[in-house]
Amino acid sequence: MILIADDDFDIASLIKISLEKADLFVSSFADPLVALKEFRSRSTDYDLVVSDIQMPAMNGYEFAQQIKRIKSNVMIILMSAFGFEYCDRSFAGPLQNSDIDAFIEKPIPLIKLRTIELTILNNKNLRYKPNVPLP
């Protein structure tokens, strides 16, 4: 099961619909605090978390850290419209020094997102690092 956290409802809905068309089970939340509460209550159900980086109340890095405290082996993909270089500099390099499995720049070609997510879910030993090119 996949959890999506993005304060942009339209983007979250578009990703959710796309993944559901691939027969994946997806929960989508505009508020990271609500998403965290859901994850906490059903952590064993989730294999993958996709989160925006810049959200109110809690940014994507903080959200990812909380998720990893609950379930350390869950896969996490962060996404942002600002690009990898900007996000890495703005947050003092957390992408390089974290358990984030992948970074995707918005707007996301949905076929690329689906390919990455299916690859990660089908091979949990494969760990994408954000500085490695994604398929």
How does the language model describe each region?
Residues 9-27:
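Two-component/phosphorelay signaling modules centered on CheY-like receiver
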Residues 62, 83-104, 111, 115:
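Alpha4 helix (beta4-alpha4-beta5 surface) of REC/receiver domains from two-component response regulators
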Residues 28-48:
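Acidic, metal-coordinating helix/loop segments flanking the phosphotransfer/catalytic sites
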Residues 105-119, 125, 129:
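C-terminal output helix
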